[in-house]
Amino acid sequence: MPKHGKKYRSAIEGRDIAEILTLEDAVAKSLGASFAKFDETVDVAICLGVDPKYSDQMVRGAVTLPHGLGKTVRVAVFCKGDKEAEAKAAGADFAGAEELVAKIKEGWLDFDKAIATPDVMALVGQIGRVLGPRGLMPNAKTGTVTFDVATAVKETKAGRVEFKVDKAGVLHAPLGKVSFGPEKILDNLKSLLDTVNRLKPATAKGTYMKAMAVSTTMGPGFKVDPTTIKKFLEG
């Protein structure tokens, strides 16, 4: 079992981290337990009642959080012609086709998100082994393969979060920074949960959102009572 440092132990002192909480309380306690000297990211982990080994139960999508993520996102757009100027006008940090692919083949990866127009995906496929493992490969299901590059760039810069359930059926996503405070974090969480709810596979059986935990980068996770999720979304 990994050993935790003094700051971690101090953060959880007097707190029952095994307690099952409402969403609101889990967020509040997570923010209250933050102890790092930097502005930690608040994360959520959601255990879904799906079996990802079946393609029709794969939950994958994207959502633009109302309050963003509180960080600068560097965006690269793979495109040609007029789309290059459109991407840059919308705020893209890098735009191009062959030249960008060539740079990446040489080891350059100074961007956080990638977008591509459909007509250059064959070219982008040449660097799929580089982009894929880093979560940078553009994908139509998350809206990052599109001819509407202006909208995609603006949404990505504004705090667009892509998510995908892992092999264990758990979905991980950031919700913003500790400095946002509970109200903005809860707003972002509601947007995420609404989107995940809409993506529920028709073949999924039983409880969809089975378990949830909220944590900060360095802090402990606080468990959420899944029966309170529906009430939170309807509130």
From Swiss-Prot:
Q: Which UniProt keywords apply?
A: Repressor, Ribonucleoprotein, Ribosomal protein, RNA-binding, rRNA-binding, Translation regulation, tRNA-binding
Tell me the superkingdom of the source. Answer: Bacteria
Extract the GO molecular function terms from the UniProt entry: rRNA binding; structural constituent of ribosome; tRNA binding
Gene Ontology cellular-component terms for this entry are: cytosolic large ribosomal subunit
InterPro entries attached to this UniProt entry = Ribosom_uL1_bac-type, Ribosomal_uL1, Ribosomal_uL1-like, Ribosomal_uL1/biogenesis, Ribosomal_uL1_3-a/b-sand, Ribosomal_uL1_CS
What is one Gene Ontology biological process annotated in the Swiss-Prot or TrEMBL record? translation
Report the function annotation for this chain.
Binds directly to 23S rRNA. The L1 stalk is quite mobile in the ribosome, and is involved in E site tRNA release.
Instruction: Family membership, please give it.
Output: Belongs to the universal ribosomal protein uL1 family.
Tell me the subunit arrangement: Part of the 50S ribosomal subunit.
- Cite the HAMAP family for this sequence: Ribosomal_uL1_B
Q: What is this protein called?
A: Large ribosomal subunit protein uL1
Origin organism of this chain?
Nitratidesulfovibrio vulgaris (strain DSM 19637 / Miyazaki F)
